[in-house]
């Protein structure tokens, strides 16, 4: 019965015990109601007392045998003795009083059953000193409840005998009244008692024998000690006294207790925060401190929700009091920038000012699209740069060069100022810079390192249209601070700077306001210097060497003089411009533009040195004889015949650099300002060439730009 808790309810299991209880209680009740009153008057009043005591004793033992734990062994846990479960032998042998007794492995309970223990197939439990499973009490009979079962049998047998005997006595005393109700009920109770007396008396006698011999029903039925010696017997009297008078065996199963429900918070859940003092430890850039702040639960939740959507805070400012070297460096850099920036010059943004720059060397060819490919030029070999000169010619490049000293040219250090006006062709128009001691060989050396001053607006147009040719890969001048050269020590601030955070239109409008203040200057003569082929590809170096051989073999062509109009052609001396003369659009754009389709001719390579008598126009300044106002987008997208002032030997020397991988047929480039050729009077197109641009209507010229854009330029 106690083992049935927690299992499925089976009504059939309670039929025998219910029937036994009904017959026992019902028959005894009838006996006390109809027979005992007459017997108490006729025989003795002790008869009902005796029967009542016996009946209570029967009920007590019946209840104890039914509801008491028979001595169930608890089962092993699932993770206990797994090795024994798989590897254990079927039996183990122990010696009791010199006799070998086997202990069998129980696969259900997962342990070796002790001696005299057996597994009940009905209760599905291993019971200590298992006797049998009695259906009349609906429980196993084991060591702990065998006493009560045995006493139940004895008391029940005695009670049945008493009921039957006292009933027979009542009938004999009232034989004249056999037809009476009392006599009839007494006779019916005697029949029931007589029917139960035979099996109960037989079972009681059987167990008396077993107790006297010290055996169990299971041992007797299975014949374990048949023909042998029982090691568990202690003699008849000892066996009886052990069953009836010994102390009860301990209980192996704990008493069933109600399970308590405990709510356990997982470790990742934050405990509830009550209103109170919260110690907050702050760590800010190495500065530690403890603040005691009063925060409520609501304020913390609001802060959490805000911090989840907010941007991460900016890095803290450095503590200048702790780092004296950094403070000195920042103060010197601030003073230098304040002295370099003129009154009319735009301020350099802070993040741009201290951004590290990388000089273009071998990495320029490897990464032509890198925005860190910058070109810087050193001071002149002939004219030293002073603070006053640098204040008049600021470079707007404050970042240091990270290139090793072995790869630096002694002329590096000053950046080229960018002027979108003079960058009309595919490669930037070459213009000689006054006041800088560059020679032709030095420019070729810079050019051999793969650097060029391609127009920022031109490259922006290429990038916007998504067409980059092989030439643009060799000329990676895509950084915003790739500036053009400011010529000569002029009092006015230079105009080549374009802020990287401004659009091209705003930058051109700002330059248009400063444009008329530039004065024309003339460049000095330069001497050639040897050429470096360090970072060029193998086929370009081979073709360049072949061209130099041809240059040494063929004499320079005579009769080519610079025409006066060439002085204002807007030529700008930029290193690496001989790589590929290119229009401001890509090769695909030049093929699409109807204004740039001319027969293949030799590219116009301007001379780097000009006579001192010829004065070049100031950077981006208008023509000396023109009064047309400056237009923001005055870039030339057409090509023209090369000027006659350019020597053929220089063209031959620069031809190896004009071989793109995408097989773009390079057109002859002619620099133009405001859509008009600079030396249009001296250079006329060939007989088979189409017009340079669309016809001028009423002083307005239409020029096709990138992506099919048409620009109207007043002449």
Swiss-Prot record:
- According to the UniProt entry, which residues carry Phosphotyrosine? 91
Segments on the Extracellular face: 35-52, 170-191
Q: Which UniProt keywords apply?
A: Acyltransferase, Cell membrane, Immunity, Innate immunity, Lipid transport, Lipoprotein, Membrane, Methylation, Palmitate, Phosphoprotein, Transferase, Transmembrane, Transmembrane helix, Transport
What are the Omega-N-methylarginine sites (modified residues) in this protein? 617, 697
How this chain sits in the membrane, per its record, is:
Multi-pass membrane protein
Q: How is it modified after translation?
A: Autopalmitoylated. Palmitoylation of the C-terminal tail regulates stimulation-dependent plasma membrane motility.
Recorded hits in PANTHER family, A to Z, give: ANKYRIN REPEAT AND LEM DOMAIN-CONTAINING PROTEIN 2 (PTHR12349), PALMITOYLTRANSFERASE ZDHHC5 (PTHR12349:SF3)
| Family of this protein | Belongs to the DHHC palmitoyltransferase family. ERF2/ZDHHC9 subfamily.
- From the Swiss-Prot or TrEMBL record, give the protein name: Palmitoyltransferase ZDHHC5
What species was this sequence derived from?
Rattus norvegicus
């Amino acid at each position: 019965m106690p083992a049935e808790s927690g299992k499925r309810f089976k009504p059939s299991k309670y039929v025998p015990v219910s029937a036994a209880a009904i017959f026992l209680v019902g028959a005894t009740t009838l006996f006390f109601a109809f027979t005992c009153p007459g017997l108490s008057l006729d025989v003795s009043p002790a008869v009902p007392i005796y029967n009542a005591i016996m009946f209570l004793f029967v009920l007590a033992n019946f209840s104890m045998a039914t509801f008491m734990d028979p001595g169930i062994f608890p089962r092993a846990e699932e993770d206990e003795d797994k090795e024994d479960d798989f590897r254990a032998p079927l039996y183990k042998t122990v010696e009791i009083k010199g006799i070998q007794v086997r202990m069998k492995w129980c696969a259900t309970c997962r342990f070796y059953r002790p001696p005299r223990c057996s597994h009940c197939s009905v209760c599905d439990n291993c019971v200590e000193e298992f006797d049998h499973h009695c259906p009349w009490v609906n429980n196993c009979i084991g060591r702990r409840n065998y006493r009560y079962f045995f006493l139940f049998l004895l008391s029940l047998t005695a009670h049945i005998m008493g009921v039957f005997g006292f009933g027979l006595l009542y009938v004999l005393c009232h034989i004249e009244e056999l037809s009476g109700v009392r006599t009839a009920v007494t006779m019916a109770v005697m029949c029931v008692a007589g029917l139960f007396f035979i099996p109960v008396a037989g079972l009681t006698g059987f167990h008396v024998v077993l107790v006297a011999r010290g055996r169990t029903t299971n041992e007797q039925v299975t014949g374990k000690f048949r023909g042998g010696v029982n090691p568990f017997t202690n003699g008849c009297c000892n066996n009886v006294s052990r069953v009836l008078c010994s102390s009860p065996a301990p209980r192996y199963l704990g008493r069933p207790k109600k399970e308590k429900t405990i709510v356990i918070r997982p470790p990742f859940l934050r405990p509830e925060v009550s209103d109170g003092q919260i110690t907050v430890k702050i760590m800010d850039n190495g500065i530690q401190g403890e603040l005691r702040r009063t925060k409520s639960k609501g304020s913390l939740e609001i802060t959490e929700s805000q911090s989840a959507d907010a941007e991460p805070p900016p890095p803290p400012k450095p503590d200048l009091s702790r780092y004296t070297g950094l403070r000195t460096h920042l103060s010197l850099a601030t003073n230098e920038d304040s002295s370099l920036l003129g009154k009319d010059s735009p301020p350099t943004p802070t993040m741009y000012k201290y951004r590290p720059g990388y000089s273009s060397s071998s990495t320029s060819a490897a990464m032509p699209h890198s925005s860190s490919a910058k070109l810087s030029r050193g001071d002149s070999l002939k004219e030293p740069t002073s603070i006053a000169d640098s204040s008049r010619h600021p470079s707007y490049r404050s970042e240091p060069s990270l290139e090793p000293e072995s790869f630096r040219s002694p002329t590096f250090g000053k950046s080229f100022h960018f002027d979108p006006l003079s960058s009309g062709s595919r490669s930037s128009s070459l213009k000689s810079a006054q006041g800088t001691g560059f020679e032709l060989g030095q420019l070729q050396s810079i050019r051999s390192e793969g650097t060029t001053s391609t127009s920022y607006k031109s490259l922006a147009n290429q990038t916007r249209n998504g067409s980059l040719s092989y030439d643009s890969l060799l000329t990676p001048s895509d950084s915003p601070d790739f500036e053009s050269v400011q010529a000569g020590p002029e009092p006015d601030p230079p105009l080549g700077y374009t802020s990287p955070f401004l659009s091209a239109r705003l930058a051109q409008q700002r330059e248009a306001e400063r444009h008329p203040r530039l004065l024309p200057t003339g460049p000095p003569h330069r001497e050639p210097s040897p050429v470096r082929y360090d970072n060029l590809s193998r086929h370009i170096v081979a073709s360049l060497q072949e061209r130099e051989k041809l240059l040494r073999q063929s004499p320079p062509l005579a009769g080519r003089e610079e025409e006066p109009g060439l002085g204002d052609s807007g030529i700008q001396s930029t290193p690496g411009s001989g790589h590929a003369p290119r229009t401001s659009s890509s090769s695909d754009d030049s093929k699409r533009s109807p204004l740039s389709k001319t027969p293949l001719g030799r590219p116009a390579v301007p001379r780097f040195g000009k006579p001192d008598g010829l004065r070049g126009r100031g950077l981006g300044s208008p023509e000396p004889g023109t009064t047309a106002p400056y237009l923001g987008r005055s870039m030339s997208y057409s090509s023209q015949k090369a000027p006659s002032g350019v020597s053929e030997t220089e063209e031959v020397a620069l031809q190896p650099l004009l071989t793109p991988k995408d097989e773009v047929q390079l057109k002859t480039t002619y620099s133009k300002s405001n859509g008009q050729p600079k030396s249009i009077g001296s250079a006329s197109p060939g007989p088979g060439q189409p017009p340079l641009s669309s016809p001028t209507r009423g002083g307005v010229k239409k020029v096709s730009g990138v992506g099919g854009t048409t620009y109207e330029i007043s002449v």
